[in-house]
Amino acid sequence: VDLFLLGHGYDKQPFNGEFNKALISNGDGSFSDVDYQSFESFYHGGASGDIDNDGDLDIVAVDGGRGKSLIYKNLNGQLEPSEALIDQALMNQMYNAELFDINNDGFIDLIAGGHDWSWGQNPECEWWSCNTYDNAPVIIYGDGVDFINNEFQRLPASGIDKQGIVTNFEFFDFDNDGQVEIIITRTGDNMNEEPGLPWDQ
């Protein structure tokens, strides 16, 4: 068993972040560690799946839109990170991700979510007093190569006020029609409230 650790760092200003780390089993109970220090960022979520259909697990790690969301291609057991394999513009405020073939075409898709709003979208606002939900979770459809210039789809707005932080995705065929639904778990976002109130958990 190998381990992959997402580097988050200290969750306070200036949110400097941290680098990711892999612990690769040596087969004798010990591990060799690999630090990806050149890709330090504010990582939150990730997932594993066979993105390129070569029979092994690749990894995605998302950093909330700082330009260093990564795809780690698995090349014979060596993880090679690249920020050029994922559309960074679609990763704005995306803090969680899953890999799942949602359209059943044989290619793994990337489903990402995080903050359902964009920072600073209205410069006349103080805090989040008049921001709106404009940054819904996104599906980037896979092609067996990367997630660049691919078709993508925004998920419908949740309609659940003040629960605009996506914490996880699950997949299940609720109505037995042969098509899998996406289950999204959320938590409170402090939107349109007074500053200084605690986050809902």
Where are these regions (language model features)?
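Beta-propeller blade termini
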Residues: 1, 43-53, 94-104, 166-174
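Hydrophobic beta-strand segments that make up the repeating blades of beta-propeller
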Residues: 2-7, 59-63, 110-114, 182-186
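Short, solvent-exposed loop/turn segments at conserved positions within beta-propeller repeat blades
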Residues: 12-18, 64-67, 121-122, 126-135, ...
